[in-house]
């Protein structure tokens, strides 16, 4: 039997973005209110993954494993955030991008296209990783780097 960890909080105000309706999530055990998703498949019901604060995950995007999305971060398109990855602040992950491992995307950073961020890499400030970019192995990309 699968134990669900969250539900769509349909009793709370929704958010409209890109002609999509996003719903707040609510933890079933604690009742804590989290961020926004378009549908239940945006956040895995297994593991400790979570979407908090005013973060938004929509489209075909997925958050799984023990990944955390927080602040006002956005994950969209078919992007995936998995493992112990963190996406926070005003960061954006979109397209077919993958953020995994113990990686962090924070500040106003943007990861898009087919970019891959993994193995404890850090992308922050207003840095951009796009196209087929790959950032791995504890690499750190900050400032206005592209």
Give the predicted meaning of each segment.
Residues 1-48, 54, 72, 114:
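Terminal amphipathic alpha-helical/low-complexity segments used for targeting or macromolecular assembly
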Residues 47-146:
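A detector of tandem-repeat and repeat-rich interaction/domain scaffolds
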């Amino acid at each position: 039997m699968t134990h669900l960890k969250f539900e769509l909080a349909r009793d709370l105000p929704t958010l409209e973005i890109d002609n999509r309706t996003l719903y707040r999530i609510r933890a079933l055990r604690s009742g804590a209110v989290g961020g926004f998703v378009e549908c239940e498949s945006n956040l895995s019901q297994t593991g400790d993954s979570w979407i908090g604060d005013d973060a938004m995950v929509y489209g075909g995007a997925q958050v799984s494993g023990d990944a955390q999305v927080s602040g006002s971060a956005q994950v969209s398109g078919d992007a995936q955030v998995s493992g112990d990855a963190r996406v926070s602040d005003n960061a954006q992950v979109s397209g077919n991008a993958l953020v995994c491992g113990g990686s962090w995307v924070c500040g106003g950073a943007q990861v898009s296209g087919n970019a891959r961020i993994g193995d404890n890499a850090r992308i922050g400030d207003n840095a951009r990783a796009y196209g087929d970019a790959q950032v791995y192995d504890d690499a750190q990309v900050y400032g206005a780097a592209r």
